[in-house]
Amino acid sequence: MSEGESKSTHFGYKTVEADKKAELVAGVFHSVAAKYDIMNDVMSFGIHRFWKRHTIEVSGARPGMKVLDLAGGTGDLTAKFSHLVGDKGEVVLADINDSMLKVGRTKLRDKGIVNNVSYVQANAEALPFPDNHFDIITIAFGLRNVTDKDAALRSMNRVLKPGGKLLVLEFSKPQHEIMRKVYDLYSFKVLPKMGELITKDADSYEYLAESIRMHPDQDTLKQMMVDAGFEQVDYTNMTDGIVALHRGYKF
């Protein structure tokens, strides 16, 4: 790359300047924030609740722990963690998108979840937290939207305590051909129509489908976590690999 030439990355299937992607992704989530929870239930037939519940179970969160729910959006995981860590624990819901943070804050406060939760607008690539600060970090359905995923994983490793655990819940690659065909049909034909009907925004859900296809597969993400300094990295496929939960530790 010549001096002064801009780096590029992908926004769905489009190639864009790397420094423009965050703004484009922000536009997607500003658009869908108000109907985000409804769309999650509709487009996953409610199965996202099972995926998130499994993530909570695997986390091993206990009273007194500090948890970072990164790209935490509307707060589904934060709500569960708040109960698990108790009054002596702390949960930070961090998201780069202020519209999502506002929805999450309002939802959790309406549920009476206020005492041990704080909200931070933050870029995953440069987390504004001290070194060795959190016992658990989760990032659910957020990593694929990050421009520099390697930088984000290194940043997560930095703020995780020794002995701490990172959980990455993300759309991935179906394991069987018939599921891949059904999933492609659903993603590219049905999902945008749902988005248009419910949020009046088909384009954002076209981006969703494309961003999933451009995201690293299970083994590639596993190696990226290893390269970022995580150890004992493994993953569990759910729903035939439509979603994978990656787990890594910092020692």
UniProtKB/Swiss-Prot annotation:
The lineage of its organism: Bacteria, Pseudomonadati, Pseudomonadota, Gammaproteobacteria, Alteromonadales. It comes from Shewanella sp. (strain W3-18-1). It is an enzyme of class 2 (transferase). Its EC number is 2.1.1.163, 2.1.1.201. This is Ubiquinone/menaquinone biosynthesis C-methyltransferase UbiE. Keywords: Menaquinone biosynthesis, Methyltransferase, S-adenosyl-L-methionine, Transferase, Ubiquinone biosynthesis. Belongs to the class I-like SAM-binding methyltransferase superfamily. MenG/UbiE family. InterPro entries: SAM-dependent_MTases_sf, UbiE/COQ5_MeTrFase, UbiE/COQ5_MeTrFase_CS. Signal peptide: none annotated. Methyltransferase required for the conversion of demethylmenaquinol (DMKH2) to menaquinol (MKH2) and the conversion of 2-polyprenyl-6-methoxy-1,4-benzoquinol (DDMQH2) to 2-polyprenyl-3-methyl-6-methoxy-1,4-benzoquinol (DMQH2). It catalyses: a 2-demethylmenaquinol + S-adenosyl-L-methionine = a menaquinol + S-adenosyl-L-homocysteine + H(+); a 2-methoxy-6-(all-trans-polyprenyl)benzene-1,4-diol + S-adenosyl-L-methionine = a 5-methoxy-2-methyl-3-(all-trans-polyprenyl)benzene-1,4-diol + S-adenosyl-L-homocysteine + H(+). It comes from the Bacteria. SUPFAM superfamilies: S-adenosyl-L-methionine-dependent methyltransferases. GO terms for molecular function: 2-methoxy-6-polyprenyl-1,4-benzoquinol methyltransferase activity; demethylmenaquinone methyltransferase activity.
